[in-house]
Each structure stands twice: as structure tokens, then as C-alpha cells.
Regions:
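Generic secondary-structure boundary/loop-capping signal
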Residues: 9, 60, 80, 138-140
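Hydrophobic helices that insert into or interface with lipid environments
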Residues: 113-118, 123-168
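N-terminal amphipathic, basic helical "cap/leader" segment at the start of enzyme domains
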Residues: 1-66, 126-128, 151-169
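Residue-level signal for secondary-structure boundary sites
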Residues: 25, 78-80, 149
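A residue-level signal for beta-strand positions that form part of recognition/binding surfaces
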Residues: 14, 67-69, 138-140
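Solvent-exposed coil/turn segments that connect beta secondary-structure elements
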Residues: 22-24, 75, 146
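Short, electropositive, low-hydrophobicity segments enriched in small/polar residues
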Residues: 14, 100, 148
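Small-aliphatic-rich amphipathic alpha-helix that forms the alpha element of a beta-alpha
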Residues: 17, 68-70, 75-79, 83-126
Length: 169
């Protein structure tokens, strides 16, 4: 029996993960699909495509300087045959459950990770080699940073010099 760390509506597991990797120890730069049955990343493209992904995300710095960005997708048919019009809603519920685990692991190992929802869908789908009518990208999760994040200084409280409007009238 397969073990999944994140639940999914109806145990249909329609959320897939891809990795767009560049500077990752033990992994050649490329685009990979995660196979949960074997626990492996299967290469789809060789080479560093992080620039293409960052461009599709509007040049967001978190995507541009991440050593790896994970992309969550949903294969519509895996959920649609059973849940029909609720499929779209389930895509985001279930991907959120998967991504919560990814974020917890990233932060637990001291790596920056954020969820990015603003990107050009077709460009990301093309990079992954998927047809958005069958499997669509939902979120990007850049993990890590090419530049170390400095320690944050102590943040003092802000005490603005304001007078209540009622005192000025």
C-alpha cells in the first residue's frame, strides 16, 4: 500500500509535483516530474530552465534566485470523473495540503519557501510539457535562495506622531 503524507479528496491523488532545478547538490539542472510510486524525480528536460520559469512568473525574485522551484499541477480527469463541477475547487484544496507539507519541510530545514500564484499558465505548462486542458499548473513554490538572507535586525515599535481626527476639528 502506498503512503501519502497529504490527504486528497476521494484518495484520487490528482495533484502532481514537478521540479525546475538549477543549483541543487546531487541533481543535474533540469525539469523533473516526481513519481510518488518510486519516490524518484524523472527527468523531462535537461538544462537550467529557471530563467524561463522566472520570466513566466513576471521576474519574481523568489523564483529567479531559487535553486529549485516546485510546481504543483492537477490532472483534471483524476478528480472530475467522481466530483465533476467541484474538481476545480478540489484542485486548490488538495494542492494546498501537499504544499503545506512542502513548506513545513523547507522551513524546518532552514530554507526559504513561498507559494507563488501569479504566473503565465501557458508558459509554465509548456515548460512542463503538459496540456492545460488535461493537467494545469496551480502554484509555484521556490525553495531556497542563491543569495543568503541576512539576519533580520530587531524591529522597534513604530510610534507615529498622530492626533485623533476628533481633536483637530
Amino acid at each position: 500500500m502506498r503512503f501519502r503524507a497529504a490527504s486528497c479528496t476521494g484518495k484520487l491523488y490528482h495533484v502532481d509535483l514537478y521540479a525546475v532545478a538549477g543549483d541543487v547538490d546531487g541533481l543535474e539542472p533540469g525539469v523533473y516530474h516526481f513519481d510518488p510510486d518510486s519516490g524518484s524525480f524523472d527527468a523531462l528536460r535537461e538544462g537550467d530552465y529557471r530563467g524561463a520559469l522566472a520570466e513566466a512568473a513576471g521576474g519574481q525574485r523568489s523564483v529567479a534566485d531559487a535553486p529549485v522551484t516546485f510546481v504543483a499541477t492537477s490532472e483534471w480527469w483524476r478528480n472530475a470523473w467522481k466530483y465533476r463541477e467541484r474538481t476545480y475547487r478540489h484542485a486548490f484544496w488538495d494542492s494546498g495540503t501537499v504544499l503545506a507539507n512542502l513548506l513545513a519541510v523547507a522551513h524546518g530545514t532552514g530554507r526559504r519557501a513561498t507559494v507563488v500564484t501569479g504566473f503565465a499558465d501557458d508558459a509554465v505548462a509548456r515548460l512542463l510539457g503538459v496540456d492545460p486542458e488535461e493537467e494545469a499548473p496551480l502554484e509555484l513554490v521556490p525553495v531556497g535562495s542563491g543569495d543568503p538572507v541576512p539576519d533580520a535586525p530587531d524591529v522597534a515599535a513604530i510610534d507615529p506622531d498622530e492626533a485623533p481626527l476628533s481633536e483637530e476639528v
